[in-house]
């Protein structure tokens, strides 16, 4: 049986202390813009002010193939998924390069790649070889859906138990943006043309095929709404179902998480329904150029940290955002207050602003 423990809220006392400390630092109030809000969020997640710099940031890339990819909805053949899993494991993918400079390590997990697992470690949570063609059939069976969601829960637990203090969800799978578009359209009541983008670089004919596949899948999923598990069974696939479980369980475990592009954020939309309130533990790493991503972010009430017109997936946008998040933590933790630095404050209300006391767990 699929179930998640209740999601608690980030710590309000640490949030208030962090906001007060931001206002006491040697700068005009609000001068660091969104960095201030991000630092306050980290403090509330860590239950301490000032917050600690992240020591074990971890990227998990969830890999899986989608039967709909054989309908001409991608510019790349399905076998690229297995090849890219090997590339990520070898350290040669974009996510490896960006995670390295961001101070994070990378794990790839095969949930439904249409090939034998590259290794026992990578395939430890494999559910099946490839997910069904969602335009004509369910992506998964009931048991497979439960297994995939549980796999995501277990992977989150494994990472948190091993000491991860920030998680990034990434994706790898030819055809996964088609499945993601269905999830977003179903949960935001959007038309297929509003959520379908050009993915890996398809042409206009490919876009038309992709839109038709999303339309057909939406017709199939309407009867199961608003059931999130039923939606994942019909149209998600094992990789997206696992991402949903991962994002939900990260929140249950009070661990901050950065979302990546449209595939991850679509799964997060479902995760919010599996574990209400989970979104408070997430930040949107970036805004993808995929049109459905903006709709999904709006539905979650999340603003992207960066907007660099990226559309790769893998966790790359979130890895870039991690560098910004680290800067936010550093500013709140390392800057001096007006009192500490002996710097005069701007006199507005005649009140001398001093640093608030530290808050520890």
From Swiss-Prot:
Give the EC number.
2.4.2.21
Its pathway is: Nucleoside biosynthesis; alpha-ribazole biosynthesis; alpha-ribazole from 5,6-dimethylbenzimidazole: step 1/2
Catalytic machinery residues = 314 (proton acceptor)
Which top-level group of life is the source organism from? Answer: Bacteria
Instruction: Give the record's GO biological process terms.
Output: cobalamin biosynthetic process
Q: What class of enzyme is it?
A: transferase
The alphabetized UniProt keywords are: Cobalamin biosynthesis, Glycosyltransferase, Transferase
The record's Gene3D superfamilies line, in alphabetical order, gives:
1.10.1610.10, 3.40.50.10210
Example of a GO MF term: nicotinate-nucleotide-dimethylbenzimidazole phosphoribosyltransferase activity
Q: Which reaction does it catalyse?
A: 5,6-dimethylbenzimidazole + nicotinate beta-D-ribonucleotide = alpha-ribazole 5'-phosphate + nicotinate + H(+)
The record's comment on protein family reads:
Belongs to the CobT family.
**Purpose:** Catalyzes the synthesis of alpha-ribazole-5'-phosphate from nicotinate mononucleotide (NAMN) and 5,6-dimethylbenzimidazole (DMB).
Under the heading NCBIfam families, the entry gives: cobT_DBIPRT, PRK00105.1
Specify the protein name: Nicotinate-nucleotide--dimethylbenzimidazole phosphoribosyltransferase
Q: Which organism is it from?
A: Mycobacterium tuberculosis (strain ATCC 25177 / H37Ra)
